[in-house]
Regions:
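PLP-dependent aminotransferase class I/II
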Residues: 5-189
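Hydrophobic alpha-helical segments with transmembrane-like composition
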Residues: 1-2
């Protein structure tokens, strides 16, 4: 599993075996987001299947040589500044409805996501997906000895990673905020 460093096709995938399912999913997502094809249900199915495969995989994954080259062309300070700006925007805005990030951002941190603890995480995640906001689950629970791992189970049920990467501008973060504000379900504990 990798995070996108840029919105470039070569960075949208990782090297695994010859299974092209994830690539098909990314193509469907792109077509759906551009309103060229109503394929969101199929994309969501592929997305879920790929997450399950990655969660249970013991295969060593690696980045392609072309992706490594593209990464060397990225302006890292600009990337960090954009991510930090998006993180701070959501921190200030979501405080208005009582939501706080799971952790504070230290001075030199470059956040990958905006981690948020919410009630009914899966329902909230589905709601966001209906509005074209896709949040990965970084804390799946394997159900191994849950009686000895209550915090792992709690994290799996309540943590969501909101997207804040450098592709998103202020209008995107405003859209995300507005969709969260409009959510009809209960988020606070």
């Amino acid at each position: 599993y990798t995070k996108k460093a840029q919105d470039l096709p070569a960075l949208d995938h990782i090297k695994t075996s010859s299974d092209n399912t994830r690539s098909y999913g990314m193509i469907l997502k792109n077509l759906f987001l551009k309103n060229e094809l109503d394929c969101n249900a199929k994309y969501r199915q592929i997305f879920t299947e790929c997450e399950e495969k990655l969660d249970t995989s013991d295969e060593i994954l690696q980045i392609s040589d072309f992706s490594r080259f593209l990464i060397s062309c990225i302006d890292i300070p600009e990337l960090i500044a954009a991510r930090r700006s998006n993180y701070h925007f959501l921190t200030l805005e979501l405080q208005k409805i009582g939501l706080q990030p799971v952790c504070a951002l230290a001075e030199n941190d470059c956040p990958l996501v905006f981690p948020l603890r919410v009630k009914n995480r899966d329902s909230f995640r589905s709601y966001l997906m209906e509005h074209k906001i896709y949040c990965a689950v970084h804390w799946p629970f394997d159900h191994f000895r849950p009686e000895f791992r209550p915090m792992a189970q709690k994290n799996a049920e309540t943590l969501i990673s909101l997207p804040i990467d450098q592709r998103y501008q202020k209008n995107d973060m405003t859209y995300l905020r507005d969709i969260i504000f409009q959510y009809g379900g209960e988020l606070l504990f």
